[in-house]
Amino acid sequence: MNERADEEGLQRKLRLIRLLHQTNPYPQGPGTASQRRNRRRRWKQRWRQILALADSIYTFPDPPADSPLDQTIQHLQGLTIQELPDPPTHLPESQRLAET
């Protein structure tokens, strides 16, 4: 079971990295030499950022399954609403005087 979870986590990371690479296609199109050069320069800057982001995604460790947050969530899911007593049918004397 743990190997399957690790494999699914790796596949999720690889899909995200692939999506990042697809969002930055190599620049093509007409234009002057300086326009093409600037497009390539900006593309190369984005490419370096994507590589750094992909590296951090791939190397970032998955949080442990029994982290304090997960334990807290499991504890909160086990809570139920208790039966509350019926509300009083008449107001106390001090509140009746305050309303008038």
Swiss-Prot record:
Give me the ranges of the annotated region Homomultimerization. Answer: 16-24
Any GO molecular function: RNA binding
Q: Which domain of life is it from?
A: Viruses
Provide GO CC annotations from the record: host cell cytoplasm; host cell nucleolus
What segments bear the compositional bias annotation Polar residues?
A: 22-34
Q: Which keywords accompany this UniProt record?
A: AIDS, Host cytoplasm, Host nucleus, mRNA transport, RNA-binding, Transport
Q: What does this protein do?
A: Escorts unspliced or incompletely spliced viral pre-mRNAs (late transcripts) out of the nucleus of infected cells. These pre-mRNAs carry a recognition sequence called Rev responsive element (RRE) located in the env gene, that is not present in fully spliced viral mRNAs (early transcripts). This function is essential since most viral proteins are translated from unspliced or partially spliced pre-mRNAs which cannot exit the nucleus by the pathway used by fully processed cellular mRNAs.
Question: What note about domains is in the entry?
Answer: The RNA-binding motif binds to the RRE, a stem-and-loop structure present in incompletely spliced viral pre-mRNAs. This region also contains the NLS which mediates nuclear localization. These overlapping functions prevent Rev bound to RRE from undesirable return to the nucleus. When Rev binds the RRE, the NLS becomes masked while the NES remains accessible.
Spell out the protein name for this chain: Protein Rev
Q: Which organism is it from?
A: Human immunodeficiency virus type 2 subtype A (isolate ROD)
